Curated annotation (Swiss-Prot):
Organism: Shewanella sediminis (strain HAW-EB3)
InterPro entries: NA-bd_OB-fold, Ribosomal_uS17, Ribosomal_uS17_bact/chlr, Ribosomal_uS17_CS
Taxonomic placement: Bacteria, Pseudomonadati, Pseudomonadota, Gammaproteobacteria, Alteromonadales
Quaternary data: Part of the 30S ribosomal subunit.
Disulphide bridges, residue numbers: none
Name of this chain's protein: Small ribosomal subunit protein uS17
GO cellular component labels: cytosolic small ribosomal subunit
Keyword Transferase among UniProt keywords: no
Name of the gene: rpsQ
Function: One of the primary rRNA binding proteins, it binds specifically to the 5'-end of 16S ribosomal RNA.
Keywords: Ribonucleoprotein, Ribosomal protein, RNA-binding, rRNA-binding
């Protein structure tokens, strides 16, 4: 196993699945020609064992082994409630 496990922070978009959440990860990318910084969003499915998250919460997630076809991240903590 590697020592540096990837962790990300994002906003919960959906919690309608059982024990799963959809998290939006925002990053800023510089336009190659004009230099303007643009927001880019990535949606990630994460495992929420206790179903404790609601839409709008800010959460920390970490990478883990594949849990399903689309889930390979798990919830670490809820940073702030919506």
């Amino acid at each position: 196993m590697s020592d540096n496990i990837r962790t990300l922070q994002g906003r919960v978009l959906s919690n309608k699945m059982d024990k799963s959440i959809t998290v939006a990860i925002e990053r800023k990318v510089k336009h190659p020609l004009y230099g303007k910084y643009l927001k880019r969003t990535t949606k990630i499915h994460a495992h929420d064992e206790q179903n404790q998250c609601n839409a709008g919460d800010v959460v920390t997630i970490r990478e883990c082994r594949p849990l399903s076809k689309t889930k390979s991240w798990t919830l670490v903590e809820v940073v702030s409630k919506a």
